[in-house]
């Protein structure tokens, strides 16, 4: 069995934690006003593309995808506070989903 075909909780959790780490890096880049912030948000967006292992977390990540996309757009438009708000909510939704998953 290929790793991507696994749908057990440890595999799903590992996948979500990887996305969570990209979100951490993107948000820290925003706070420090890194010149590479767009690249970091792009990495977070890229990690959200495609299906999750077994597709079981796709619905939850759809909201996160939308918020990250909006955050990137607001940041490009110079609306730092609104962008940070979107990114923080996306990050928190992801963290709460990981916590819920750990209770399965």
Describe the residue ranges of each PLM region.
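Long, charged/polar, soluble alpha-helical segments
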Residues: 1-104
């Amino acid at each position: 069995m290929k790793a991507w075909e696994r749908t057990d909780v440890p595999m799903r959790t590992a996948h979500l934690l990887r996305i969570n780490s990209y979100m951490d890096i993107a948000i820290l880049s925003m706070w420090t006003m890194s010149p590479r912030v767009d690249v970091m948000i792009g990495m977070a967006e890229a990690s959200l593309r495609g299906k999750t292992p077994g597709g079981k977390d796709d619905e939850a990540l759809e909201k996160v995808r939308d918020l990250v996309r909006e955050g990137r757009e607001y940041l490009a438009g110079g609306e730092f506070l609104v962008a940070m708000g979107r990114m923080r909510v996306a990050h928190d939704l992801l963290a709460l989903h990981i916590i819920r998953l750990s209770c399965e």
